[in-house]
Design a protein with these regions (language model features):
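Conserved phosphate-binding loops in nucleotide/dinucleotide-binding enzymes
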Residues: 76-77, 81, 283
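A conserved non-catalytic segment of reverse transcriptases
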Residues: 173, 249-313, 321-323
């Protein structure tokens, strides 16, 4: 069976449809949703396969959208139609089976059983072995500047099937629709489709192999690459050499201003930076990543929205953001920050919303008294009355010892089934578990 026949097999296409549906995602330029995929393929599968086998299949232009990057700029994405997405996914599944055993052990992005945690473990291994000079490579607009002819040439080294190579080139040249205008694509691999990650890794695998042949220690995650050496002199020499190689061999431009040589404490890789304890190098989230988490929570807890929203909905939104952030950065050392800074700040903000939802001093008094009696907290009637009727603003009122103690972390974390309200995640407990 040829590669294109494997790609178009019933099993492979069905798996592709299943994955595209599971990933959901926005519609392409034809507005077809993922929910329409199965009925569409049931009706048109035969003609789609025939057009591909006859080299007559024409992928539609991708729809250009922009998403914010961590540095505040916008990242362009290209959203294929859902039918094109299925074909891309089917190709990607077979390419992964070919390339996974070929790819470098030091490439971590978009690969099975690899993620930022495995990448960071390797970085820490290098640092603790004494490779403490870091070359932080920045490839300018990598996905937008991949050379099509070079990529096809690299593909042909492992993919000996003209139909498959032809189909991949068609996807590369499908064009982009931006604000209703279609422009051709003669360069680049648009991010947003299932084929983009594997093609980007295939292209940069040549770079990985070059670094390996030189005996260099490196970690690459998609287009983010750090190289680790023992001295600043070696770092200068390696940076010049690999920059030249990338530009000559892969036609990629390395940013002269963003590519830098740093010590680990000044390094920023995948949202982490580094510090040295008595037991060795460790990683932690960058300060700006902590700041972005806090900004997201501030948006959820914006008073005019959060006060009018059911508390259960607010807790659900908060839990989703906090758990997702901690899951990503869990490998980093951040116990002290979560315990002493983030956790108390979060609960203070939540208490403000709860007390403001109670509105009237009498309601505040009644509710605090209920908690006081239910948990035998021991506050006097006068203490609770004083807090409920204070002239302090909401924020200062909810910072008092009485409110902090009564609306405790434990109380907030308990779900309320009657009101269909989940418990608020305790960030420290979630991080430590």
């Amino acid at each position: 069976m040829s590669l294109i026949e494997e790609i178009l097999s019933i099993e492979n296409l069905n798996e592709a449809i299943k994955r595209v549906k599971a990933n959901k995602g926005a519609s392409g330029i034809d507005k077809m949703s993922v929910d329409m995929l199965e009925p569409y393929f049931n009706e048109h599968r035969k003609e789609i396969i025939e057009s591909i086998m006859n080299k007559a299949y024409r992928p539609k232009p991708v729809r250009r959208v922009y998403i914010p990057k961590s540095n505040g700029k916008l990242r362009p994405l290209g959203i294929p139609t859902v039918v094109d997405r299925v074909i891309q996914q089917a190709i990607a599944q077979r390419l992964i089976s070919i390339y996974e055993n070929i790819f470098s052990d030091f490439s971590y992005g978009f690969r099975p059983s690899r993620d930022c945690h495995t990448a960071m473990n390797k970085v820490l291994e290098y640092l603790n072995q004494g490779f403490e000079w870091v070359i932080d490579l920045d490839i300018e607009k990598y996905f937008d500047t991949v050379n099509h002819d070079k990529l096809i040439s690299i593909l042909r080294e492992q993919v000996n099937d003209s139909h498959t190579v032809h189909l991949i080139r068609k996807f590369l040249q499908a064009g982009v629709m931006d604000n209703g205008l279609v422009s051709s694509t003669t360069i680049g691999v648009p991010q947003g489709g299932p084929l983009s990650p594997i093609l980007s890794n295939i292209y940069l695998d040549k770079f990985d192999k070059e670094l390996e042949s030189r005996g260099l220690h490196f970690v690459r995650y998609a287009d983010d690459c750090n190289i680790f050496v023992r001295t600043d002199v070696a770092a200068e020499r390696v940076m010049k050499s690999v920059t030249s190689w990338l530009e000559r061999k892969l036609f990629l431009k390395v940013s002269a201003t963003k590519t830098k040589i740093v010590k680990p404490t000044d390094s920023n890789f995948l949202g982490f930076t580094f510090w040295q304890s008595t037991s060795g190098w460790q990683c932690k989230p960058q300060d700006n990543r902590k700041g972005k988490l806090i900004e997201k929570i501030k948006i959820i807890l914006k008073r005019k929205h959060a006060v009018s929203r059911p508390l259960g909905d607010t807790f659900t939104k908060l839990n989703q953001v906090i758990k997702g952030w901690i899951n990503y950065f869990k490998i980093g050392n951040m116990k002290t920050w979560i315990r002493d800074t983030f956790g108390p700040w979060l609960r203070h903000k939540v208490r403000v919303i709860i007390v403001k939802q109670w509105k009237k001093p009498k309601t505040i008094y009644d509710n605090l008294m209920k908690v006081n009696k239910a948990y035998n907290n021991g506050f006097t009637d006068e203490e609770i009355y004083s807090v409920a009727n204070t002239r302090l603003g909401w924020y200062r009122q909810c910072g008092t010892k009485t409110v902090n103690y009564l609306i405790s972390a434990d109380l907030l974390s308990k779900p309320n089934k009657k009101r269909n309200r989940p418990g608020l995640v305790n960030p420290l407990s979630y991080y430590l578990k």
